[in-house]
Amino acid sequence: MKLWGGRFTKETNQLVHNFNESLSFDQKFYRQDIRGSIAHVTMLARQGILSEQDKVDIIRGLESIQKDLDSGALTISPDSGYEDIHSFVEGTLTERVGEAGKRLHTGRSRNDQVALDMKLYTRDEIQEMDGLLRDLLEELLAVMEANLDTFMPGFTHLQKAQPITLAHHMGAYFEMFSRDRSRLHDIRERMNYCPLGSGALAGTTYPLDRAYTAKLLDFYGPTLNSMDSVADRDYLLELLSALSIIAMHLSRFCEEIIIWNTNEYRFVEIDDSYSTGSSIMPQKKNPDIAELIRGKSGRVYGALVSLLTTMKGLPLAYNKDMQEDKELAFDAIDTVKGCLLLFTGMISSMTFRKDVMEASAKKGFTNATDAADYLVNRGVPFRDAHGIVGQLVLTCIGKGIALDDLPLEEYREISPVFDEDVYEAIRMKTCVEKRTTVGAPGQAAMRDVIAQYRKQLEQ
């Protein structure tokens, strides 16, 4: 069944049909298409545009189509001759309920229909991704709560910098993924206006009640410009941008896990169930899942750039180029959902080697800043203290020892301000625990933050 053809004298070339059809991929939102159609005919009947009997017959037919598609009793084949999911649903409906099915499209264009379907689908997927992000945040919070006193080195430039805790490190990613949830929420708020009733681009002469249709579909209200309604893909660009940032956060985290999982670091061990082996090297246990998640970020970025490039030269209103949005959005959404699901499972099954982390934190002079602060607290200007401790570090490097092991007399040779209590000041636990400002790794600060995170997840 075609939704057009009266003014044509030739059949569509098969290659043209194959190139033009979208049923092979837009069948993904058949539920949203049916939901939108049910709302549309409900409004049409309320406005007296359709008879009550036509409404009943159409809704009965649409519900039977969804039931059969859900159960597998009805399948969608790209070879069926239908151009897209809209024509498939309308054609199948007409086969089932007869003449009434031909009235389904009254007061509607595929342009506003597909805009609605994509918004409904995007809204549903945002809800699902929000749940996946929440699951990940719950797992990160559990790791934080269990590791308030698991010391590890913090890094800058991949060089050891200062001692922190595993809880503090996980908290950084908690913040990132919390922002990701917030971005998805913002997108949903901005896009939650109903385009149905905009027609092809100029509305319709039928007395539609667009506000009623919007209410039936849980939108805040109707969109206010019919041309923008059918030509707008900003919400998809925003979504792809947000998904790209999620993918970037996952990629950064995976990069750290890959590094931590090496024999050189040994901070973590990825569970066997989330690892793979080598076809030639029997000893290998590879972090393939982390590497794949890291790699798939480029795929998501590509979708964003592709859609931006598609949209940049399009005049108003609808253009067929916009059909390209679906495969890009579908793939990016599925990719990020899969990555979130796998990443959460990988984190939940991962072993954190606390003893290795703590031993590493004791090396590399991570307490040097605290030695400088010790001097500052005794009246030495920070810039002078910085230079003094730099000399201490150089002395320790020459002797192959840590600051903790340098004799007091050698401290005092460089600065007489040092006293016996310097060793307590630069002890790793002291270095971490005295950092109590908001956002710092000390237990007092971390407990307050964790309480806020827990409250955030319970809302």
Predicted features and spans:
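Acidic, glycine-rich loop-and-beta core segments that form the ion-binding/anion-interacting portion
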Residues: 217-309
